[in-house]
C-alpha cells in the first residue's frame, strides 16, 4: 500500500499532463503529494522524512513553475531531489562514518561494513547519474520525452537498481541469514 501511495502523485502528474498541460500536471502533483502526506499522517500517525522533504520541494518548485509559468522549475526539482539524496548518502559515509543505507536497513540486515559502504556509495552514484540524465533530458529534449522519462524511465531505473542492490545484499549476507 505504501509503495502505491508513493507512486500515486507521479501517476496523477502523468495523467494531468496527458489530459491538459505541464502546469495542470504540476498543480495536480502538488495536491496529490499533499493528499498522500496527509493520508500518511492520519492513517499511520507518521510522516517519513523523505516524504516531507519531497513534498516541500514539490511545493516550492511546483509553486515557482505555476507562478512564473515556466516549466524549468519543475524540471529542476528532480535533479535537486537526487542531489540531496546523493549528498545525504555521501555525508553519512564520509562525515558521520556510518552509511545512511546501514542506518536505514542495519536493524534488519547483518552485512560487513565494506558492503554497507559500497552499497551506500553505489546509491549515491546512481542518484548523481539520474540527476545528470534528468538535466540532459529535461533541457535538451522535448517536454513530452522528459515527462515520460520522469514517470517511466526513472521509475524503471530505480526498480532495476533496487533489484540489483537486493542481489548484492543477498550475495554478501552471512549464510545463517539466507534462510
From Swiss-Prot:
**Does Translocase appear among the keywords?**
no
Gene Ontology annotations for the cellular component aspect, listed alphabetically: plasma membrane
Coiled coil start-end:
none
Q: Does the keyword DNA-binding apply?
A: no
Q: Name one Pfam family in it.
A: IspA
InterPro entries associated with the record: YciB
Its annotated compartments are: Cell inner membrane
Keyword field: Cell inner membrane, Cell membrane, Membrane, Transmembrane, Transmembrane helix
- Its chief place of residence is membrane
Q: How does it sit in the membrane?
A: Multi-pass membrane protein
Highest taxon above the source species: Bacteria
**Chain's role:** Plays a role in cell envelope biogenesis, maintenance of cell envelope integrity and membrane homeostasis.
HAMAP family on file: YciB
> Which family is annotated?
Belongs to the YciB family.
Q: What is this protein called?
A: Inner membrane-spanning protein YciB
Please give the organism: Klebsiella pneumoniae subsp. pneumoniae (strain ATCC 700721 / MGH 78578)
**In the record, what lineage is assigned to the organism producing the protein?**
Bacteria, Pseudomonadati, Pseudomonadota, Gammaproteobacteria, Enterobacterales
Q: Name the gene for this chain.
A: yciB
Amino acid at each position: 500500500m505504501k509503495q502505491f501511495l508513493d507512486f500515486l502523485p507521479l501517476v496523477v502528474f502523468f495523467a494531468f499532463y496527458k489530459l491538459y498541460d505541464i502546469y495542470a500536471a504540476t498543480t495536480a502533483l502538488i495536491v496529490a503529494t499533499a493528499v498522500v502526506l496527509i493520508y500518511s499522517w492520519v492513517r499511520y500517525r507518521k510522516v517519513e522524512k523523505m516524504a516531507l522533504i519531497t513534498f516541500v520541494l514539490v511545493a516550492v518548485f511546483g509553486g515557482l513553475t505555476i507562478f512564473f509559468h515556466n516549466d524549468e522549475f519543475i524540471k529542476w526539482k528532480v535533479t535537486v531531489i537526487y542531489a540531496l539524496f546523493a549528498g545525504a548518502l555521501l555525508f553519512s559515509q564520509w562525515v558521520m562514518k556510518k552509511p545512511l543505507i546501514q542506518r536505514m536497513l542495519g536493524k534488519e540486515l547483518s552485512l560487513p561494513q565494506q558492503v554497507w559502504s559500497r552499497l551506500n556509495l553505489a546509491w549515491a552514484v546512481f542518484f548523481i547519474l539520474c540527476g545528470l540524465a534528468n538535466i540532459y533530458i529535461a533541457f535538451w529534449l522535448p517536454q513530452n520525452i522528459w515527462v515520460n522519462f520522469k514517470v517511466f524511465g526513472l521509475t524503471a531505473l530505480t526498480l532495476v537498481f533496487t533489484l540489483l542492490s537486493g542481489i548484492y545484499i543477498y550475495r554478501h549476507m552471512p549464510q545463517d541469514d539466507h534462510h
